[in-house]
């Protein structure tokens, strides 16, 4: 969206260009290229976000104090509703979701685990887990604060924001129209980095799973190193193309974040439970575990998709 606002290029064209770029360096450089680019992109992302928040505070009439005053008066700094409703994003529901989704990410997600395996020693792998865990909360808080600061900013300067603008487009609009030229480029690079980092990680981890769990397992001949590398590169290209097609299909959704949460819950549903079964209950048979995962997936599909087909959901 920032690139679209800045250049006027169509969003589908930007999706295709970005996807091809990520596919190329993921396929040619492998996990080393992904880790190094992710590290650099992460630094750019956090640095850009900090600068953006500072600029917002500078531009507000009363600075940080005024931001806190307006945000507090409009209940924008609260932790959310404290009720126990399952149909609203209450504090307890988000806390419950956050605990289990991060337990799955750090314990069962291939895109995380391959980084542990790629570390030189177990000690280095543990350090990466602690670093990621400790950074997660402050970085998330930073972006939440930017969202709140944007709300306060456009309460102070409502004429600067088109009335019919979708929520996902407010941040790109601010970056392109309110920031100095050099800082605009840095912030666009930061947001671009976030998207590229997520895509490259998914491409590389998916290709690794296809090689380790399918191609090597079902191949009748022992694979040479060159054959494995070629398969990884081909898989990276195929997965990257599929990712581009999915992104194009979901272009224009009302909320990218809500859509991501819904898709993540559907496609990753049951995976954490499966890993915990294997870790804690050694006597569970594979068939029993797969039935449990299947039932869990059906339940998630029902709760997530039933409103789109006119059926009542258990949560509503």
Predicted features along the sequence, with ranges:
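Membrane-embedded helix-loop-helix hairpins and adjacent transmembrane boundary segments
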Residues: 1-316
């Amino acid at each position: 969206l920032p690139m679209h606002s800045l250049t006027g290029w169509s969003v589908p064209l930007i999706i295709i260009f970005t996807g091809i770029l990520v596919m190329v360096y993921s396929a040619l450089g492998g996990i080393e290229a992904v880790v190094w680019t992710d590290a650099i992109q992460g630094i750019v992302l956090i640095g850009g976000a900090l600068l953006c928040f500072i600029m917002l505070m500078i531009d507000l009439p009363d600075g940080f104090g005024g931001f806190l005053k307006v945000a507090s008066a409009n209940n924008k700094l609260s932790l959310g509703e404290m009720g126990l409703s399952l149909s609203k994003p209450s504090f307890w529901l988000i806390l419950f979701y956050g605990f289990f989704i991060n337990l799955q990410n750090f314990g069962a997600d291939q895109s995380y685990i391959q980084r542990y395996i790629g570390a030189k020693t177990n000690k280095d792998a543990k350090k990466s887990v602690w670093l990621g865990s400790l950074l997660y909360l402050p970085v998330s808080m930073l972006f939440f604060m930017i969202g709140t600061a944007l709300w306060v900013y456009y309460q102070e300067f409502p004429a600067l924001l088109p009335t019919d603008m979708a929520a996902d487009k407010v941040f790109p609009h601010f970056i392109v129209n309110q920031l100095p030229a050099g800082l605009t480029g840095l912030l666009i690079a930061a947001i671009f980095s976030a998207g590229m980092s997520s895509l490259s990680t998914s491409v590389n981890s998916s290709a690794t799973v296809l090689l380790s769990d399918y191609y090597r397992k079902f191949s009748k001949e022992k694979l040479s190193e060159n054959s494995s590398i070629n398969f990884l590169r081909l898989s990276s290209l195929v997965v990257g193309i599929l990712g581009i097609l999915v992104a194009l299909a979901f272009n224009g959704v009302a909320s990218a974040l809500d859509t991501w949460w819904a898709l993540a819950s559907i496609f990753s549903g049951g995976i954490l439970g499966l890993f915990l079964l294997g870790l804690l209950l050694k006597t569970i048979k594979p068939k029993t575990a797969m039935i449990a995962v299947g039932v869990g997936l059906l339940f998630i599909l029902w709760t997530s998709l039933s409103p789109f087909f006119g059926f009542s959901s258990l949560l509503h």
